Structures are given as structure tokens and as C-alpha cells.
UniProtKB/Swiss-Prot annotation:
The lineage of its organism: Bacteria, Pseudomonadati, Campylobacterota, Epsilonproteobacteria, Campylobacterales. One of its GO terms (molecular function) is thioredoxin-disulfide reductase (NADPH) activity. It is found in: Cytoplasm. Its main location: cytoplasm. Disulfide bonds join 133-136. This is Thioredoxin reductase. Keywords: Cytoplasm, Disulfide bond, FAD, Flavoprotein, NADP, Oxidoreductase, Redox-active center. GO terms for biological process: removal of superoxide radicals. Belongs to the class-II pyridine nucleotide-disulfide oxidoreductase family. The keyword Flavoprotein applies. Binds 1 FAD per subunit. The gene is trxB.
Length: 311
């Protein structure tokens, strides 16, 4: 039987594996179908991880993690997981190929991904001017003009954040009304650096080999079209958490989740199910930063060590 099963191989999962194995967990297994690394491997530049002074790509950044985290005995099972369920005091893990595993404890570190819009040019310029993380990429646009797309809390909050760095922020939303907290909207409207463009949609993201150069936008009320010259577009139209592994045969969820499907945990990354932990972007209130996901993974592993000692 597996002592600790880790579902997901991003920064949270890898950190959990490192801390679990170094902490004496004899049989720790990481379940990740492909090479571990997580969605950060798709990032073109990382410069906000403490201790890493050079600007590196996400792929280069995560490569040493794999080597270090497997050095202490973490095993890698290259298979996708379909479902995790509880059977008595242990867990049953069903892989997509039908194979089953049993584990004393489980850390869910499956992460999530920002929703995409399908706008023409979005895929082409993803990571080359199109971003979903103002904290990660905002600094690259210091004293430049950028656009933010979205009408919820995250979009408006990130527009305010970017206004502290950028020369100007265009906040684009398809409706006149916003879904964010009124006080947040008020702060944005009182910020002279933020210009509201409503009701507008982005029809195309344009650019060249160096990245985004402009946006084609259209007013949905008047059909007026205009070109917005900006080197960056930040998209905040929602976030999908990868919680499918929690869904049971009767369609219930293995543990408590919030309205968005994120796993409810306490400060030690424990869920409401004994022996089940969660770390990284899958958990509630996740800051969605690599350094935070790594911290979560370490915390979850320490909680697992304590759990295994007493069970």
C-alpha cells in the first residue's frame, strides 16, 4: 500500500513529494501522466521566485525541481487519475487505464487553469503578450499601456494592481455592468490611470514575432470598431479547477468544495476527510503563484507525516 499518494506534478505536488520523502515517508508516489512541472512550464519568463536571479523560462525553471524532488525516493507513476475514493481508513485511486492503487493518505495537487476566450490570436500570443497573471507579468509592462479583459472581481482588482505599474490600463468588458464588489469598482473608477471601455469585446489580438502589438475591439451597442495599441492583454474571464478526481460514482464530491469547486482546507492543508489533503491552485483562496503552491505542498507533506505517525 502507498503511504502517500500525490495527485498532480506541478510545484505543489513536487514540493509535497520532496518534503514527504525527506521527512521519512517510505512509499510516496506522484501520479502525473506526463513530465512533472505543471502549467508554469508554459510561461515564457519567470523572475519573481526568490533565489532565482536570472529571468528563465518556466520549462527551464522547473527542470531542477524534478531532479531534486525525485532524489530522495519519490516514485513517479506516469498515469492520469480518474477518481480518488475513500474505503474504510484508506483511499482507492482509479487510474484512467483501469488500474487501481491503495493509499493511506492522499494529497490533491491537480491545480487549475484560467479560462480561455477563443479570441483570434489568443493561442498564438499566449505568453507573448497575452497573460492571465498580473502579479507574474505586470512588471514587464512598467510605464507602458496595457488592456485588461473581464468584468468580475479578479479583472477589476488586477486592473487596479496594474495601474500601480503601468502608464495606463484599459479595462474592457462586454457589458456596462460589472460583477465585482461595488467598493472595488469604485476604487477602479476613481483611479485616473484606468479607462473603462464598455460595452466592448476584443475581436482579434494582433502582433508580430516580438509579441502583441494591438487589439481590434468592437462596441457591442454601436458596432463601432477601433484599434487599441497595447503590447499586453491580461485576460480574467474565470478559472477552472481540476477537481474531476474528486467526483464519486454517485456524482457527490469526495470532500468539501466551495461554490467554484475549489477544495476547502485549513491552514495545514487538511480537508474535511481524514487523510486527505490539498495543495496549490486547487485549494480555496489560492494566490496562484509558484512560490505559494510550493509552500502549500511542503505544508501538506508535513501534515501527512504527522497523520501517518498517528494512524
Amino acid at each position: 500500500m502507498i503511504d502517500c499518494a500525490i495527485i498532480g506534478g506541478g510545484p505543489a505536488g513536487l514540493s509535497a513529494g520532496l518534503y514527504a520523502t525527506r521527512g521519512g515517508v517510505k512509499n510516496a508516489v506522484l501520479f502525473e501522466k506526463g513530465m512533472p512541472g505543471g502549467q508554469i512550464t508554459g510561461s515564457s519568463e519567470i523572475e519573481n521566485y526568490p533565489g532565482v536571479k536570472e529571468v528563465v523560462s518556466g520549462l527551464d525553471f522547473m527542470q531542477p525541481w524534478q531532479e531534486q524532488c525525485f532524489r530522495f525516493g519519490l516514485k513517479h507513476e506516469m498515469t492520469a487519475i480518474q477518481r480518488v475514493s475513500k474505503k474504510g481508513s484508506h483511499f482507492v485511486i482509479l487510474a484512467e487505464d483501469g488500474k487501481t492503487f491503495e493509499a493511506k493518505s492522499v494529497i490533491i495537487a491537480t491545480g487549475g487553469s484560467p479560462k480561455r476566450t477563443g479570441i483570434k490570436g489568443e493561442s498564438e500570443y499566449w505568453g507573448k503578450g497575452v497573460s492571465t497573471c498580473a502579479t507574474c507579468d505586470g512588471f514587464f509592462y512598467k510605464n507602458k499601456e496595457v488592456a485588461v479583459l473581464g468584468g468580475g472581481d479578479t479583472a477589476v482588482e488586477e486592473a487596479i494592481y496594474l495601474a500601480n505599474i503601468c502608464k495606463k490600463v484599459y479595462l474592457i468588458h462586454r457589458r456596462d455592468g460589472f460583477r465585482c464588489a461595488p467598493i472595488t469598482l469604485e476604487h477602479a473608477k476613481n483611479n485616473s490611470k484606468i479607462e473603462f471601455l464598455t460595452p466592448y469585446v476584443v475581436e482579434e489580438i494582433k502582433g508580430d514575432a516580438s509579441g502583441v502589438s494591438s487589439l481590434s475591439i468592437k462596441n457591442t451597442a454601436t458596432n463601432e470598431k477601433r484599434e487599441l495599441v497595447v503590447p499586453g492583454l491580461f485576460i480574467f474571464v474565470g478559472y477552472d479547477v481540476n477537481n474531476a478526481v474528486l467526483k464519486q460514482e454517485d456524482n457527490s464530491m469526495l470532500c468539501e468544495c466551495d461554490e467554484y469547486g475549489s477544495i476547502v482546507v485549513d491552514f495545514s492543508m487538511k480537508t474535511n476527510v481524514q487523510g486527505l489533503f490539498a495543495a496549490g491552485d486547487i485549494r480555496i483562496f489560492a494566490p496562484k503563484q509558484v512560490v505559494c503552491a510550493a509552500s502549500d505542498g511542503a505544508t501538506a507533506a508535513l501534515s501527512v507525516i504527522s497523520y501517518l505517525e498517528h494512524h
